[in-house]
Amino acid sequence: MIEKPNFFVFTGGPGVGKTTLIRHLQAEGEFVVEESARAVIREQATSGGTGVPWLDAKAFCDLTARRDIAIFDAMAGETRRVFFDRGIADSYRANDVEPSAELVEAIRTRRYNRRVFVFPPWREIYETDNERRQDWAEAERTFDKILSVLPEI
C-alpha cells in the first residue's frame, strides 16, 4: 500500500475549472500533475489510434489508467505537496467502463490524501473543444458518475 497524504486530487465533471486552477497553482510554485486523459487523446489523434472515449472507451480508460498509475508510482518518493488534475479512478467511472483487475488493484494500493477537491458542474464556463466533446447534459452525467468514485480515491 502506498499512502500519499501529500497527494491531492482535483476531480469533477469536464470543463469546470480544474485545469485552470491547476495551472494557477503551478504558476504560484506548487507541484502539479496535469490530466492524463487529454494527453492520451492528443497522442491517439497524432498516431491515428482509436483509444479515445468516443471510439473505444475501454482502450481509452486503460491507456489513461496506465499513465496515471505510472505517474503515481514515479512520484511515490515525492515529499512536496502535489496537486493532481484527476485521480487514477476517474476515467473508468466517467466512461462507464468496467475496470480491469490491474486498475482495481492500483486503486486499492495507491492512496491519495482523503481530502479530495470536487468541482461541480458550472454551466457559465463550460465549453467543448476537440478533446472535450460532451454536451452540457453529458457533462452533468459525467459529474454524477465521478461522485460515485470518491470512496475509492
Predicted regions and their residues:
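Conserved substrate/cofactor phosphate-moiety recognition/catalytic segment
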Residues: 23-67
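Glycine-rich phosphate-binding loop used to anchor ATP phosphates in small-molecule kinases
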Residues: 61-111
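A glycine- and Lys/Arg-enriched "phosphate-lid" helix/loop adjacent to the NTP-binding pocket
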Residues: 99-153
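Conserved lysine of the Walker
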Residues: 18
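Hydrophobic anchor at the beta1->P-loop junction of P-loop NTPases
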Residues: 10
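Walker A (P-loop) phosphate-binding loop of P-loop NTPases
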Residues: 15
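Phosphate-binding P-loop
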Residues: 1-5
